[in-house]
């Protein structure tokens, strides 16, 4: 047809061919070669899974997801379709082409476990997301099923990729659900570390979005985990991410750490998880784990910007449709590029403590304050150490302002419970640094304002460093972080206090009245009682045969000595505060009796509705109504 056509026809055909070749060349430019990305990387293919959820923008704003994507349109060249190194996704029929780093991990024998029950689609989506991770070939991947019988109809063995090993936990215990999950975790840890002899373990729940670069993150943080014996784990999550700067290199360490995306070495397993399957628990494994870490005086490392995020679905573990939660909007890192975290020696406990002290104490006091920082609240309660009042009297907020390079007028120190002042300061453009002096009694009133976790998370020895509305924010616990505070701001434990155990159904107020004599009167002070709301103090006075467990009653801290399921447990709580005039028939309270001369701090614990009902019932039972 070309040869027989006239000149105009031949010209038309030539133009079409030139345009076609030009578009073909433009498309080819989207396809990388080994030379484009260096010899240290390879191109790997994965079957395309439409059910795998798309990563979001990572800024906590779902509306920004589409705007942040780079779209690759076949046969259309565009300046907006620029390639990012190690961040490539090309529409290929039934295939996704991905650049994967072939750099070998430094871990000797690491494992990843996706832990799930019966959500087949969630499990499979998680498996495919994990198998796409850069460097996953150096990990052994497992799926641990807590409800294997419910998934037989889905032919899990045949559906699972050959690179994945299935663990089945067939448990006769079905209720309560949090006990079944706790037992599943213990089973899985035994399998990974005892039977398969792995050196490190990453645990992922089946409803999480994961950052493509998490294995590089773990490879770097594992070195500090293995080096520092005061560290128990690394977490990929941050409960306070809404109040953090989007600094992908910044890491923290703290107690009351996040419980998602936990990474352990063998030391962590031996210290915590090498136990028999529990037959009873008052709460979930995560509360138990944090309590165990607190007993051991150990902490975990976690990022300012999470490397995982909750999905929001009909049957998600934590976040469900229409539940009002904002967890699925938390910022998290979605970039496929590995982040060089740099020198992590600042996370070693001594270095971390020194940095914090340097922010608050002048050079002449640093060593003294650092020594005070090693004094625990237990030491103060038990008389093993005393408050260094002389040093506290020399502490002032002017050094903190100077250290931050701001005027004192640009810093605002807010005392406990002053919610209205906090709201006002957050919107004040002239304020660059906010220090909140807090206690457990008032944490829940400030947490929603600052978009913090409902319970205290991420504190290191009573201090928490954040950024809200472009302002640096420091929270200081007036009991735990006493060594950083001026004397007037410390909540002191009174050395004249007397600790006593109560009889069943005896309140702390009644204990203190019983202890009083004609020459010495004692009272129950709720602010002093909060000091002994901890496992270490319960174990001083009760046998606690089955250890400590978490509860939310306001008769805490208590020992259960009657023939009920919790017999032999010592119970305490980090989420609620104890009351003086509360008691129940099945427990014995641990009480603090103070002299009337004790300093009156005036903190008033939040009283739960259930507590008010129980107090009325107790008065009826005692014939006081």
Enumerate the language-model features and the residues they cover:
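Peripheral/terminal regions associated with large enzymatic or DNA-binding modules
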Residues: 4-203, 208-489, 608-625
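Short linear interaction motifs
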Residues: 281, 489-495, 571-574
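Extended repeat- or IDR-based interaction platforms in eukaryotic proteins
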Residues: 448, 464, 558-563, 591
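Extracellular disulfide-stabilized recognition modules
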Residues: 488-506
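Folded, disulfide-stabilized extracellular/luminal domains of secretory-pathway proteins
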Residues: 500-578
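Short, structured beta-strand segments at or near domain termini in extracellular proteins/domains
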Residues: 576-608
């Amino acid at each position: 047809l070309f040869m027989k056509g006239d000149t105009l026809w031949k010209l038309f055909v030539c133009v079409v061919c030139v345009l076609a070749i030009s578009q073909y060349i433009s498309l080819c430019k989207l396809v990388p070669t080994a030379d484009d990305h260096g010899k240290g990387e390879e191109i790997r293919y994965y079957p395309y899974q439409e059910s795998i959820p798309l990563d979001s923008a990572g800024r906590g704003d779902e509306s920004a997801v589409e705007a942040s994507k780079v779209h690759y349109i076949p046969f259309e060249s565009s300046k907006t379709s620029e390639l990012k190194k190690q961040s490539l996704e090309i529409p290929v029929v039934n295939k996704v082409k991905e650049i994967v780093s072939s750099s070998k991990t430094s871990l000797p024998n690491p494992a990843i476990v996706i832990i799930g029950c019966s959500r087949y689609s969630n499990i499979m989506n998680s498996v495919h997301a994990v198998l796409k991770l850069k460097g996953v070939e150096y990990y052994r991947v497992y799926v641990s099923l807590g409800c294997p019988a419910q998934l037989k109809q889905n032919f899990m063995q045949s559906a699972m990729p050959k690179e994945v090993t299935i663990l089945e936990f067939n448990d006769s215990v079905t209720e309560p659900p949090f006990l079944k999950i706790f037992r599943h975790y213990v089973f899985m840890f035994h399998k990974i570390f005892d039977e398969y002899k792995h050196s490190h373990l990453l645990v992922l729940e089946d409803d999480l979005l994961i950052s493509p670069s998490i294995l590089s993150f773990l490879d770097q943080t594992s070195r500090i985990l293995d080096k520092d014996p005061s560290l128990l784990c690394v977490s990929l999550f941050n409960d306070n991410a809404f109040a953090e700067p989007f600094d992908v290199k910044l890491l923290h360490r703290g107690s009351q750490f996040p419980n998602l995306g936990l990474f352990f070495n063998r030391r962590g397993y031996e210290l915590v998880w090498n136990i028999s399957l529990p037959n009873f628990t008052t709460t979930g494994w995560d509360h138990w784990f944090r309590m165990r870490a607190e007993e051991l005086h150990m902490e975990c490392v976690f990022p300012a910007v999470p490397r995982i995020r909750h999905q929001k679905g009909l049957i998600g573990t934590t976040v469900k449709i229409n539940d009002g939660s904002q967890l699925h909007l938390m910022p998290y890192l979605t970039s496929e590029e590995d982040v060089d975290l740099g020198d992590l020696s600042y996370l070693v406990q001594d270095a971390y403590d020194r940095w914090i002290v340097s922010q608050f104490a002048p050079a002449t006091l640093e060593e003294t304050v650092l020594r005070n920082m090693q004094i625990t609240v237990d030491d103060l309660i038990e008389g093993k150490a005393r408050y260094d009042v002389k040093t506290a009297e020399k502490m002032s907020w002017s050094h903190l302002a100077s250290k931050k390079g701001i005027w004192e007028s640009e810093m605002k120190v807010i005392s406990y419970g002053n919610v209205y002042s906090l709201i006002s300061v957050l919107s004040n453009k002239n304020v660059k640094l906010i220090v909140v002096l807090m206690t457990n009694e008032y944490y829940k009133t400030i947490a929603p304002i600052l978009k913090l976790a409902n319970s205290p998370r991420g504190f290191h020895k009573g201090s928490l460093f954040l950024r809200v509305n472009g302002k640096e924010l420091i929270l200081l616990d007036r009991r735990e972080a006493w060594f950083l505070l001026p004397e007037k701001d410390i909540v002191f434990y009174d050395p004249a206090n007397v600790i006593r155990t109560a009889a069943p159904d005896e309140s702390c107020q009644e204990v203190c009245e019983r202890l009083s004599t004609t020459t010495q009167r004692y009272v129950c002070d709720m602010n002093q009682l909060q000091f002994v709301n901890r496992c270490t103090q319960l174990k001083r006075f009760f046998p606690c045969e089955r250890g400590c467990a978490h509860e939310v009653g306001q008769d805490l801290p208590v020992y259960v000595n009657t023939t009920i399921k919790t017999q032999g447990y010592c119970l305490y709580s980090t989420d609620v505060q104890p009351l003086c005039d509360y008691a129940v028939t099945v427990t014995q309270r641990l009480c603090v009796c103070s002299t009337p001369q004790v300093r009156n701090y005036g903190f008033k614990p939040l009283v739960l509705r259930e507590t008010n009902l129980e107090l009325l019932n107790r008065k009826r039972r005692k014939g006081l109504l």
